[in-house]
Amino acid sequence: MKLHCCLFTLVASIIVPAAFVLEDVDFNQMVSLEANRSSYNASFPSSFELSASSHSDDDVIIAKEGTSVSIECLLTASHYEDVHWHNSKGQQLDGRGRGGKWLVSDNFLNITNVAFDDRGLYTCFVTSPIRASYSVTLRVIFTSGDMSVYYMIVCLIAFTITLILNVTRLCMMSSHLRKTEKAINEFFRTEGAEKLQKAFEIAKRIPIITSAKTLELAKVTQFKTMEFARYIEELARSVPLPPLILNCRAFVEEMFEAVRVDDPDDLGERIKERPALNAQGGIYVINPEMGRSNSPGGDSDDGSLNEQGQEIAVQVSVHLQSETKSIDTESQGSSHFSPPDDTGSAESNCNYKDGAYENSQL
């Protein structure tokens, strides 16, 4: 319950009893004025405080318990003896009933010492010159039970309950804020995995509060909340997330399979395990980490070292070792039959061996 509800209850508990007191004062003043107006009729006793002129247009008379009331019959009668009064219970009222409580004088009904049971409808009947009736409602204010004290007690009890509930809520909120601030301070003092655990505890402890409580919480923990958010961001970047990493790795593997990118580390092993091809050439990928040759033309390509590496497809022919030996034997046999060309054949044989050796190395 909010603070303005407490203030409203407090104001109501003060205004209601004051209204009862003011009503009693106004009623007593009205009674005294009406008694002065009714003083023209000398036949009325001086104890009557209300006259027939006090009723309103809807023929209702309001009287306080313990006072006396005079009700006038507004019908025209040739003789006052022809006027008869009856209450709401149907009893005929005269001076003989209840020890002179009701007194009929001319066309007036005087009720002394009005009680709460006297409330109801009072009707006067006229028999001459014509038969007619006139009714007046009497309402009695109940004051013997002291209702003002009753209302004051009820309002005080309601205000006390409201005050206790608000104080309890404020104490709980203050305790919660202290615990939250303590948890944030412990978060700043911890390191590693415990920091993440403290972050979860703080997240559980921060409630979802609206209106003024949110503003109060923001004012109390504004700076530390910003620090906490910054530390959480740094912690989220440093702590690995296994499911996310596995998903990224699976995505990268699918991408590698789609573009068929070979791993340079496994390239040498794949070349060794690959069987020798026949005379038809195959396409091989040259390892970019291979050293440059010591040829004289290599110095002219020093400027290409800083350029981005590119893949070059080279078509080569690979021969088996048995084929190489047979070719070598045939070349040696031919050298015996042609001695004049011994020097040229030897040079061609050496060049062929060097080429075969380089091809086997590749």
From Swiss-Prot:
Residue segments, region Disordered: 282-306, 319-362
GO cellular component terms given for this protein: plasma membrane
Residues of the Ig-like C2-type domain: 45-137
Glycosylation sites recorded in the entry for this protein: N36, N41, N110
Extracellular side: 20-146
Cytoplasmic face residues: 168-362
UniProt feature, compositional bias: Polar residues: 319-337
Cellular localization per UniProt: Cell membrane
Keywords associated with the record: Cell membrane, Disulfide bond, Glycoprotein, Immunoglobulin domain, Membrane, Signal, Transmembrane, Transmembrane helix
PANTHER family per UniProt: MICROFIBRIL-ASSOCIATED GLYCOPROTEIN 3
UniProt protein name: Microfibril-associated glycoprotein 3
Species per Swiss-Prot/TrEMBL record: Pongo abelii
